[in-house]
Amino acid sequence: MKLKFYTIDARYTDYLREFDCKVPMEHTGQRHRPYIGIVLEIHQSLFFAPMSSPKKKHLNMHSLDIYKIQDGKLGIINFNNMIPVLDGCYHLLDIANEEEKYKFLLYNQSRDINRNHEKIGKIAKKLYSMYINNHLPEHIKSRCWGVSRVLCKSIQ
């Protein structure tokens, strides 16, 4: 299964944030950049797992709620910020339309993510299972998604 990059509608995340303050906001500032991530199916529900651009701190991070893309050199996937998604709330990212430097990063991230797609799926499913069964360490549970999964079911 090839993993692709998606963006998510800001209106949808704004709606979820009304009920769950842990739902991340889009990056704004000098250059508006929507959240980019992957979509995974976990127990018959779809989840959007956002990625984070490379930062020095990623190189030394060790936690079960992240996946380090190329050992953190290319960023991370933040499983702790996964949100449930519905069809129409997320859209395939056309990497070819991105700025050259950013396009290069996205292609490299895509290569690593697709080489390790099975591992990524296992991490997401394990974290989700630990969360719903109340087996996550408290310091990780406090970072993870909250009511947004319930809300997603209620708006379907």
Range-by-range predicted roles:
Residues 1-31:
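GIY-YIG nuclease catalytic motif and its immediate N-terminal context
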Residues 28-30, 41-78:
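Compact nucleic-acid interaction/catalytic patches
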Residues 35-39:
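Short beta-strand-centered aromatic/proline hotspots
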